[in-house]
Amino acid sequence: MKTAIFYLTQNTEVRRTHLKTSLYFLFKHFNAKYRHPVIILHEGDYDFKAQEDILFSVRESCRSLVSFVTLDPDDFKLPDHIDRRKMENCIALKCTPYWRSDKYRMMCRWWLVHFPKYAAGYDYVMRLDDDSIIEEPLNYDLFEWFEKNNLDYASNMLHSDCGICCYGMKQFFEDRYPNKKELLGSMFNAQEMNMLAVQMHPFRCLLSIMHAPDQMPKFDKSITLWSPLMYYNNFFITRTSFWEK
């Protein structure tokens, strides 16, 4: 069984502090015993001194388990099919307090599209955010547990995501997988939103950007939004062959 634990991070003072803390608890409560390789992915901003700073924060007996890998320069390039101006106009509306930047959205895409090539050659991989903390000792090897139970994916939490942030997701999947509508129906919660409220004005503007005038959704006072139930994937373990199907 070939395994690895992956981080994706940036070389800023705040993120380095988070990463050091995460690594401390990773080894204290799990990996000093089970000794899985730890791979820190970055966009080329971790020079020798920065890498050394991180390595010296890890207990000496475990430093050899930690390595750094620079991402391909094109990994975070905006795809050609995306209209940059339209995207920037949508982001500028800030429809919710946690409306995300273009870089954050590219990061989400990276985990789905590009991460598998860095996980190639491993049977199972774990993802941790650089601010993830394993708070208590784990008295069993998570990878062995994962393999024993013949799992494809495991996370520590399910949550209901924002219906505004995920607008159009349910319809997209139903159009792409018409024979899975019943299953998809169980994966989303309906929300009725009052479209006359002044707080919904940014979302109304978003709809006008996303849809041609003759394709605008019809609503009198409210609109149904669909919130997906999804894994909180700041922590997960997965079988790499699942993503190669």
Predicted segments — roles?
Residues 3, 31-39, 63-66:
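Short loop->beta transition adjacent to catalytic acidic/histidine clusters or analogous donor-positioning motifs
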Residues 1-24:
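N-proximal low-complexity "stem/linker" segments adjacent to membrane-targeting elements
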Residues 120-135:
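Short beta-strand-to-loop acidic/aromatic patch adjacent to the donor-nucleotide binding site
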Residues 57-121:
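Active-site-proximal specificity loops/subdomain of glycosyltransferases
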Residues 36-44, 69-75:
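Short beta-strand/loop segment that forms part of the nucleotide-sugar
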Residues 15, 44-52:
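Short, charged/polar "capping" segments at the starts of alpha-helices
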Residues 24-35, 57:
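Short, acidic, metal-binding catalytic loop of nucleotide-sugar glycosyltransferases
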Residues 90-104, 108, 116, 132-245:
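Conserved catalytic core of nucleotide-sugar-dependent glycosyltransferases
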